[in-house]
Amino acid sequence: MRRSVLVRNPGHKGLRPVYEELDSDSEDLDPNPEDLDPVSEDPEPDPEDLNTVPEDVDPSYEDLEPVSEDLDPDAEAPGSEPQDPDPMSSSFDLDPDVIGPVPLILDPNSDTLSPGDPKVDPISSGLTATPQVLATSPAVLPAPASPPRPFSCPDCGRAFRRSSGLSQHRRTHSGEKPYRCPDCGKSFSHGATLAQHRGIHTGARPYQCAACGKAFGWRSTLLKHRSSHSGEKPHHCPVCGKAFGHGSLLAQHLRTHGGPRPHKCPVCAKGFGQGSALLKHLRTHTGERPYPCPQCGKAFGQSSALLQHQRTHTAERPYRCPHCGKAFGQSSNLQHHLRIHTGERPYACPHCSKAFGQSSALLQHLHVHSGERPYRCQLCGKAFGQASSLTKHKRVHEGAAAAAAAAAAAAAAAAAGLGLGPGLSPASMMRPGQVSLLGPDAVSVLGSGLGLSPGTSSGRNPDPGSGPGTLPDPSSKPLPGSRSTPSPTPVESSDPKAGHDAGPDLVPSPDLDPVPSPDPDPVPSPDPNPVSCPDPCSPTRGTVSPALPTGESPEWVQEQGALLGPDG
């Protein structure tokens, strides 16, 4: 028969069972094992001795009942006082000789520790077993009370800590704006707002983004810009689903879906959802342009327009299409371009089923239904409903102008080839009211049809009083085989200086007899045998102009007779 006793192991605080072989007739054993007490109630073991687990216990003998009467002499006496466990100590001991921790539960009915159920969580049991620790934990302090706000607004009830804050707030109800900008005259209700506004004129941008280095003149603008780096857009439009990084941007966007527009323009009664948008719109009526370009001096009514304009000098195109790679200087142009790839046409005509990708295209299309033609040609006054139609129409004038310039150049080249000389202009050879379709210089060709050879000026009036561009009357020039008749009396024209004009106003009168002219300088009768006076500037100097037969004319006169008319 085998029995187990608890003995103290040298070098170890706890007790360990020792199994010995006993005879069945041993006197030490109680013949009735049922009377054995499993655990003695009189001796109170040391808690340190209980906080161990035997390392060499055979699992098959775990259910053996220890015998309390054969305790080791070194064990504590039954009357010894147990030591109170430290409430702050750990509920289990991690001795290197111990296999694992044994949880100890504080019995609420006693002051001793007893082995507990191994299934109990040691951490939770340790927390629940030491109510003294909870009592000594620091108490949670209440939140400090907010400072009092004794100054309340009588209009809206808002409270302020200082009277100055209330005074500034009441200006929002009264509309008082005592702080005026010396540059543009704009007024503000707060001095800090004026200081930020003046940065627009001075170019100061004290608020800089730490991520990209971009600077802004307003702190609120910087806060809105930061959401572009994080990509977080928690505010979604309930109408179209568009997301925004700030609630204020969503509120502004909701007004595009038919929201309230409380800010009305006093000039045209147009409504706006924001007061800043109304101020920008008023500049279209006043013509104010407070934002000049530092490179070219061009001024703009909005700072955003100036920034977009400055990209024309720097050639900066920061907005690139993800589909085709095309870059743009403005984000709005990129948005319009993206509709080419997506096929989106959000602007529908209310009169027909046609839709457009841009609002400007819809406005031009509406002119088709209304009949309005706001685009007018500056040359002919013709009006069109679309700007593209006016552009196409202007090409008609450009082609006509090019043709007229080519005809004038050809006529000038022909006149230069005749060598009429500097004193004979084409305008002096035309009668009053006569129009030539060959151009202003084409009339100079008329001189060769009157018997003038190229390079000569036959029959030029030698009278120094006559104009340098006058020609003799063709009827006074005798032809071969004809009689020479006396010169008819000229009829004075409306020009007060008769005989000194260019000659086309002197018309012969066959009904009147020849009467001596009272003019002291009458036109001399031509010589029956005229001799050409050589032109010192003509390359054909010394040649005689050939005479034409009666009733004949040069070929070019016959060909151009329809253009020159019967008087040519």
UniProtKB/Swiss-Prot annotation:
**UniProt keyword Metal-binding, yes or no:** yes
Give the InterPro entries listed for this entry.
C2H2-ZF_Transcription_Reg, Znf_C2H2_sf, Znf_C2H2_type
Gene3D superfamilies assigned to the protein according to its UniProt record, in alphabetical order? Classic Zinc Finger
| Alphabetized UniProt keyword annotations | DNA-binding, Metal-binding, Nucleus, Repeat, Transcription, Transcription regulation, Zinc, Zinc-finger
Q: Which residues cross the membrane?
A: none
Disordered as annotated region, ranges: 1-117, 448-568
In which domain of life is the source organism classified?
Eukaryota
One Pfam family here: zf-C2H2
- Quick check: keyword Transcription regulation in the entry? yes
Low complexity bias: where? 448-459
Identify the main location.
nucleus
| Annotated Basic and acidic residues bias | 494-503
Q: Where is the composition biased (Basic residues)?
A: 1-15
**Any Gene Ontology biological process:** regulation of transcription by RNA polymerase II
Cellular compartment(s): Nucleus
Positions with biased composition (Pro residues): 511-537
PROSITE patterns in the cross-refs? ZINC_FINGER_C2H2_1, ZINC_FINGER_C2H2_2
Q: Zinc finger (C2H2-type) residue ranges?
A: 151-173, 179-201, 207-229, 235-257, 263-285, 291-313, 319-341, 347-369, 375-397
Q: Locate the compositionally biased regions of type Polar residues.
A: 482-492
Q: Which GO terms describe its molecular function?
A: DNA-binding transcription factor activity; RNA polymerase II cis-regulatory region sequence-specific DNA binding; zinc ion binding
Which family, according to UniProt? Belongs to the krueppel C2H2-type zinc-finger protein family.
What biological function has been recorded for the protein in this entry? May be involved in transcriptional regulation.
**Name of this chain's protein:** Zinc finger protein 358
Q: Which gene encodes it?
A: ZNF358
